[in-house]
Amino acid sequence: MEFPYHSTVSYNGVTFYFNERATRAYFICGGCLISIPRKHGGEIAKFGHVVRGVGPGDRSVASYVRSELNRTGKTWAVSSNNNCVFLDRVALLAAGSGAVDRDLCGTFDVEVEDPTLADYLVSLPVTHLTLVAGVDVTRENKLKLFPTPTAINTTNGFMYVPNEASFSLVYMRMLELPEGLQELVSGLFDGTPEIRDALNGSNDDEKTSIIVSRRAADVVTEDVKADDVPISGEPYSEKQPRRRKKSDHITLSNFVQIRTIPRVMDIWDPRHKATTHCIRALSCAVFFADEVIFKARKWPGLEDELNEARETIYTAVVAVYGERGELPFFGHAYGRDLTSCQRFVIVQYILSRWEAFNCYAVIEDLTRSYVNALPSDDDTDQVAQDLIRTIVDTANSLLREVGFIGTLAETLLFLPLPQLPCYKETSHLAKKEGVRILRLAKTGVGLSDTVPVDVSVTERHEYEISRYLDTLYSGDPCYNGAVRLCRLLGSSIPIALYYNTISGNAFEPYFAGRRYIAYLGALFFGRVHQTPFGDGKKTQR
């Protein structure tokens, strides 16, 4: 589902998205979108995922969420039936005992701390699971709700394929906002003037085109238990006459206009596997990477679904490397002559080679389609040997760098590091990713997050890892950083770790390498899912 918007306003600490004439505003609440009208008595609508069950017609997940809300003292949040248990009710379970709807506003991310609920949703009893229900694509002024939420393990960065039967994307007309949300939106439209229709001066609610896949969203009308009451002076709390869902006639809200689009390809779908991992095919994909992803026009023979996937890949490239390739990542020492898009393809190849989440199969399909569309007199066997050597060196150095920083983090957790009188400044990116590496390292060596650790010790670990990340990201070889750490610690352990990781390669899976891939996946998807997409047009790198 896609919702175009014209402008945004920050009000009471929450971002609101206005349509073109400012007659209606959207805001995010617990992974769902709520639409409110300017006009007194206008329709309020809610768009989002409801939880269902583990199979067709099953409502076990919805029943479990309702029972947990009752058990934890949040009876006020329990819906009247199993058909309307929205994702924001799931968010309430992990939001603390005193949480209300107001506390869920502003994010599409929904935390799932209950392993039983996680087992229902992704068939694994994991903790620290995050469901990402949508995204704000600021470049396009669009809010997007995914067909099925993306499930991410925030501890290690792994992505899971959710049970599709557990979710359904629906639209519901609301008769009132919850009390906390009424206070949030009170006075919202006062500071935003309405833009009247230039042709007839009408101030009727503007039609909003909501774009959905061919499997359109269900239409659910809330069944209100309360008796009819007179309209009050508060525009978002009025009880309107009771409406019942009729099997033979359901209508959309006055402001909604549904448009269908072809199904959007999930480029990270693990069921879509690459046909080959030979170096020659990888070199071809790297050679044509910029043309395949950044070429503005659709070439002959390119399927619509693959064409749509190019935009998704582009946003992932921007998230990892920046709009102009300004964000550093691993493999820079040997890959500095490659574009960010080419380095992205190499990362996807490595993840695919080791059977982690990746989109290399889609890139392979795009490359094959592009090469087939080239004129017959073009020489497609034009990948130079120098480029092949660069690709191999970049892939190997990338995995070795990730492996070294991961094993270093695991080792530092057990070493008594000398305290420093002060810390040198490190980049914000290195600090954030250093924390992610250490969190995964603790999991890898069996240390629980619940074990108390002195704050100064944690800061010391984070400083060393973030400082070393800055060194790697600048293109400095692993060896130099390992030697510096040997001097600091008065120990040869760092250089021994270096020689242990330097022998591995990215093209032949081996046991220790699987741990390295866990770090690579955590850092890569940490950027893809947490870095906002920048504004602007596609820029050649």
Swiss-Prot record:
Pfam families found in the cross-reference section: Herpes_UL21
TM stretches of this protein: none
InterPro entries according to UniProt: Herpes_UL21
Cell compartment(s), UniProt: Virion tegument; Host cytoplasm; Host nucleus
Main location class: virion
UniProt keyword list: Host cytoplasm, Host nucleus, Virion, Virion tegument
An example Gene Ontology CC term for this record: viral tegument
Domain of life: Viruses
Record's keyword annotation contains Isomerase: no
UniProt subunit comment: Interacts (via C-terminus) with UL16.
Family statement drawn from the similarity comment of this UniProt entry: Belongs to the alphaherpesvirinae UL21 protein family.
Function: May participate in DNA packaging/capsid maturation events. Promotes efficient incorporation of tegument proteins UL46, UL49, and US3 homologs into virions. May also play a role in capsid transport to the trans-Golgi network (TGN).
Name of the protein in question: Tegument protein UL21 homolog
